[in-house]
């Protein structure tokens, strides 16, 4: 694996010079191998090690290099034809392959090659970009988007129209991460490498980036870039120091543990926020 990483790191330093016409065989094979390993889930751009999320930057670099070495090609689809550098994940799947991998894909859901989809996942008409990792038992609901290299945990529900930001455009240092057992409400956006920790509930229409203030009304603490585990979050505003205006923020209205989540439905958690 170290040899593979070295090839990627070296090629990335001269990425501006690389084109589909001049990409050397060693680089091309290394990039394709990494994309295949990401596609199978054998590698992932970020993983939790000793309780901390670690981003493997060289894997992200391999994804970026794939756009340099590959030319656009015609991609056949049920409703239309497409023209892109990245093939679709399911282009060569037959019924036996779908049965073996054990997830559902509702048309016209689109998943790019290099994204991993785990067992018991349901993809409604949605979009999952290259390098993303979607773990077991997750629902990606209608018109939800999982951005490049985003990490989605087990038993997550991404509601209709949710946007989970990617790392490629604009270029971000770390992927957006939604940990296990989270619920992200309809039309919410979580971007710029924000981490939503395990068991959190994000209400409908909440927007969280690195600069968004995440205000805990019980403690008065303000978080940036991280929603603490077990948080129930709604959209809100905080007043300016002079009291003349207010600016958007996300508000943690309560904390819940796994036991409470097991007894109380998501809708009930969001309705009883006073």
Curated annotation (Swiss-Prot):
UniProt enzyme class: transferase
EC assignment: 2.3.1.117
Pathways per UniProt: Amino-acid biosynthesis; L-lysine biosynthesis via DAP pathway; LL-2,6-diaminopimelate from (S)-tetrahydrodipicolinate (succinylase route): step 1/3
UniProt signal peptide: none
Coarse class of the protein's main subcellular location: cytoplasm
SUPFAM superfamilies: Trimeric LpxA-like enzymes
Name under which the protein is recorded: 2,3,4,5-tetrahydropyridine-2,6-dicarboxylate N-succinyltransferase
Name of the gene: dapD
């Amino acid at each position: 694996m170290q040899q593979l990483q070295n090839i990627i790191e070296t090629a990335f330093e001269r990425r501006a010079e690389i084109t589909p016409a001049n990409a050397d065989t060693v680089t091309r094979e290394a990039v394709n191998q990494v994309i295949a390993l990401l596609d199978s889930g054998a590698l992932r751009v970020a993983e939790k090690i000793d309780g901390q999320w670690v981003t493997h930057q060289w894997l992200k670099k391999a994804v970026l290099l794939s756009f340099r070495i590959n030319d656009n090609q015609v991609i056949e689809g049920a409703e239309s034809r497409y023209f892109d550098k990245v093939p679709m994940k399911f282009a060569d799947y037959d019924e036996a392959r779908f049965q073996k991998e054990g997830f559902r894909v509702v048309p016209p859901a689109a998943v790019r090659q290099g994204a991993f989809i785990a067992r018991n996942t349901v993809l409604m008409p949605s979009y999952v970009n290259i390098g993303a990792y979607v773990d077991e038992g997750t629902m990606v609901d209608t018109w939800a988007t999982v951005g490049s290299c985003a990490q989605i945990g087990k038993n997550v529900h991404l509601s209709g129209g949710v946007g989970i930001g990617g790392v490629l455009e604009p270029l971000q240092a770390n992927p957006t991460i939604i940990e296990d057992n989270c619920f992200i409400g309809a039309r919410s956006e979580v971007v710029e490498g924000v981490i939503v920790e395990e068991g959190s509930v994000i209400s409908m229409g909440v927007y969280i980036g690195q600069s968004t203030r995440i205000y805990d009304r019980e403690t008065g603490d303000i978080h940036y870039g991280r929603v603490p585990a077990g948080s129930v979050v709604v959209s809100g505003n905080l007043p300016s120091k002079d009291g003349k205006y207010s600016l958007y923020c996300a508000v943690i209205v309560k904390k819940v543990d796994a036991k409470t989540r097991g007894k109380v439905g998501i809708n009930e958690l969001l309705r009883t926020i006073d």
